[in-house]
Each structure stands twice: as C-alpha cells, then as structure tokens.
C-alpha cells in the first residue's frame, strides 16, 4: 500500500497570478498526526479559485488551488478517529474544530481555525505536504483539491454516505451549500417573501433554489448576462432583470418592481462592492435583509450612506451558507440522496482533470455554471 509513503501524482499548480495552471508531478507527504490523506475523485471549478489566479483574492504562491471536491480516504495520521481509509469524504474549506468561539456558539459557523482570512496557505502546524521540483507548494484554504491526492487536517474533512455519486456531491463542498444556505440558514427566508439574487452563477442559482425551498413567492434574478436567465427560471426565479436594460440604478428598478417597497431579502453573489451596496439599497428600508455571499476582493473598501442601515435594514455576511460544516455536509448529502434537491442543473460541464484550464476559460466567458473535473 501507499500508507506512510510519499505519493507522486498529478496536480495543477498556480505558480504566478494571471497565468494558466500548470499540470505537473508533485510529491504528497504522508499525513502527520490528526491529518488525513485523500484521493480526490471529483472537483468543481469555483469562481473563488479564479479570484486567486486573477490576483483579486491574495494568496501565497505557488499554490495547489481547488476547494470544492469529494474523494476517498487513502490513509490517516496518528490519532484520527473521524474517518478511516476507504471512507467517502468531502474536504471542508470551513473547518469545524468544535472548541473555538464560533464552533461553540449556536449562531456561528466560521471556525477560527479557517485559513480564509489568515491566508497562510499552510497546514495548521505551519508546514506544507506538497513539493514540486524541490520547492514547497502552498495549500489552499485547508483543502487543495486540484491534485490526485491532498492532505487535510481532521477538522477539515467529513465522512459522507458511501453510495453518494462524488461527481455530483462535490458541489456540496462549496457552491451549492454556500448559495442554498445563504437563503435557508443565514437569511432564514420566510414563506411568501420577495427575494432578489444578484449574480446567477453556480452559487447564485443555489441561492435561488434556497429561496424557492423556503417558500418565497417572488424570486428576482439580477445579472448582466441574459444567457443566465432561462436556467435561473428553471431553478425557481419568477422573473429576471438585466441592469444594463435600464437607465436608472438597479435598486430603483427593484423598488419599482415591488410597488415601492423593496425586496424582503437580497443576496449579493458576485463579490463586487458596487453590487453589495446596490443589493442593500434594494431591500425594504425597515425590515429588509441583504446577505453578502460573493467573495469580496482583498483590497476593496465600501462606501455607503448610513441612512440605509439607520432605518432598520440588516446587512449580513455568509460563509459556506452559515452551515457548521461537519454537522451539515453529511446531512446535505443525505438530503440530496433523498432527492430533496437536484444538483444536475448546476453541472453544465464534466471534463477530465487535464482540461482544467479549459474549464476556467468557460467560467470566465460566462459559458458554464459548474464544470466538474474527474480524475
């Protein structure tokens, strides 16, 4: 077997920003105590991976990107009890240590052991398990799935149903859960309410699905790419608007569409500061809630009129849909297996891992929702 040995395998490496990923052979060290080595079988391409490549989301390079995935445990380090070799698993970019303030709180889900904000690009012990040509490679947000094998901390992996199709449930590792949870878990959308979703990519469409599941009576999709509208309507949007079709700001358009009231809930699923303030301004001045779901660029700051908040609006962020990862991912996989929701409409392309750069080109061109790479 491979347990306890260095594994040589294929990975896509980001050596520098604004360059295609490079598929090369890397060495993956065995897991240390409380770590798990996973054979990745399916991984989705998410806009957040592209934000690192573009330089918008600052991370230390070289790095093995990818964070939306599913696979099988190859081996475990000393002291690991939550999974065993052969288990089907999903790596978690939001860990759940069970001990920190966020994990202990019923209201929190962003475990403080996450590497989203610190951006060290390393394992919790401050080292890497990846090398290429004698050079150490960084890990990406506790996961790194653009590789045949990865190593994660035991707080960043969870066992799922052995019968689950990994090429579909990999989306529960990020895109689906992030959007769906923003509606049902973070916003707690109420039946009969009106929602607006800004950005109709994979996460935005999942937010649309969440609004529908929560019983929203109107779900307005907002995107400057009208090619996204048919799919949004298929997923539950009752109408779609393109801000480029109007002379007035989109928040005024949404007020007009709601009889001057504004929407009950708005979701910004793009990651732009201008659309974040527009989404806030689109919701009801008193009890409206706006959720920031899109990953904001590292360097950006936001300016807005405090009057927007003073009247009673709520502005809230949501990471991984507000779900506590270890508690929720297995349950979401079970719900999928029980056909409580479908992931098929989100997966527009399936391709071999070697075509990863083509997958990113489809994303940038607005031609895909989710591309799933198979090893």
Curated annotation (Swiss-Prot):
SMART domains given in the database record: PKS_ER (SM00829)
Entry EC no(s): 1.1.1.1
Signal sequence annotation: none
Chain residues that bind NAD(+): 199-204, 223, 228, 293-295, 370
GO terms for cellular component: cytosol
InterPro entries linked to this entry: ADH-like_C (IPR013149), ADH-like_N (IPR013154), ADH_Zn_CS (IPR002328), GroES-like_sf (IPR011032), NAD(P)-bd_dom_sf (IPR036291), PKS_ER (IPR020843)
Subunit structure comment from the entry: Multimeric (with different ratios of monomers).
Protein name in the entry: Alcohol dehydrogenase 1A
Organism: Saara hardwickii (Indian spiny-tailed lizard)
């Amino acid at each position: 077997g491979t347990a306890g040995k260095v594994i040589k395998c294929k990975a896509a490496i980001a050596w520098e920003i604004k360059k295609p990923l490079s598929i090369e052979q890397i060495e993956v060290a065995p897991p240390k105590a409380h770590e798990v080595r996973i054979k990745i079988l399916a991984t989705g391409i998410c806009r957040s991976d592209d934000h690192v490549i573009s330089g918008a989301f600052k991370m230390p390079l070289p790095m093995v990107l990818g964070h939306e995935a599913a696979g099988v445990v190859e081996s475990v380090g000393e002291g690991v009890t939550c999974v065993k070799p052969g288990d089907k698993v999903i790596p978690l970019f939001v860990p759940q240590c069970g001990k920190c303030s966020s994990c202990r709180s019923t209201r929190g889900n962003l475990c403080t052991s996450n590497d989203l904000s610190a951006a060290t690009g390393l394992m919790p012990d401050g080292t890497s398990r990846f090398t290429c040509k004698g050079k150490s490679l960084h890990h990406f947000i506790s996961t790194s799935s653009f590789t045949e094998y990865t190593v994660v901390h035991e707080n960043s992996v969870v066992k799922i149903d052995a019968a689950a199709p990994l090429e579909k449930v990999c989306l529960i590792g990020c895109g689906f859960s992030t959007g769906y949870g923003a509606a049902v878990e973070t916003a707690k959308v109420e039946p009969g309410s009106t929602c607006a979703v800004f950005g109709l990519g994979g996460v935005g469409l999942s937010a649309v699905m969440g609004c529908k599941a929560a019983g929203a009576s109107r779900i307005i999709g907002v995107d400057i790419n009208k090619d996204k509208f048919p799919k949004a309507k298929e997923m539950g949007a009752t109408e779609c608007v393109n801000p480029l079709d109007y002379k007035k700001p989109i928040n005024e358009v949404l007020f007009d569409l709601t009889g001057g009231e504004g929407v009950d809930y708005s979701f910004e699923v793009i990651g732009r500061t201008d659309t974040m303030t527009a989404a806030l301004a689109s919701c009801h001045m008193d009890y409206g809630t706006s959720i920031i779901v899109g990953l904001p660029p590292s360097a950006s700051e936001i300016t807005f009129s405090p009057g927007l908040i003073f009247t009673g609006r709520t502005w809230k962020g949501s990471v991984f849909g507000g779900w506590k990862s270890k508690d929720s991912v297995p349950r979401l996989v079970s719900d999928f297996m029980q056909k409580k929701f479908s992931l098929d409409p989100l997966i527009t392309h399936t391709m071999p891992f070697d075509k990863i750069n083509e997958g990113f080109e489809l994303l940038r061109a607005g031609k895909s929702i989710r591309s799933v790479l198979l090893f």
